Amino acid sequence: VLREDAAVRDAAYSIVEHCDWMPALLIGAKHINEVPRSRCAAGHKAMWHAKWGGLPSEEFVCSLDPVLAGFRDRLYSETTTAEKPVGKLCPEWAERLGLSTDVVVAGSEFDCHMGAIGAGAKNNTFVRVIGTSTCDIMTVSPEELGDKLVRGICGQVDGSVMPGMIGLEAGQSAFGDI
């Protein structure tokens, strides 16, 4: 969209991942800076990493595509893992859903990563999640993995599947409705 539609590009202020938008909506976040950001989404899709202070530099981002100029400074530096509360249900959504404003809203992560948890993922367990896409997920302790970079996978992110574990993601094969 940014490459194809200058009007959209010029009007765009930032970018929000769907799994970040849903908790933000439920807690009543009104400004982009109030949107809780998923470690899973940030790490696997935006190259977020604590070692370099969050997201890649503006220079790096622009080297990938100059159309991304300016977005880096309007994004985020902090992320949260899915087990941590990001707020409570706002009055609007509490009323719409017939729930209390005391309902705690958790952080988020991608469907595949949550599917791995549902399938019983634990340290050194390989899980293949099959749905509209197919992902291979494995978790490894940071002590065991150390500074190794696993080649040939699409993501290696601390806390993206389970807290305190490195989530390894491979696959993303087309599946389902194709």
Predicted regions and their residues:
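Catalytic phosphate/nucleotide-handling subdomain of diverse soluble enzymes
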Residues: E95, V103, S108-I178
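Gly/Ser/Thr-rich active-site cleft segment
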Residues: V1-E109
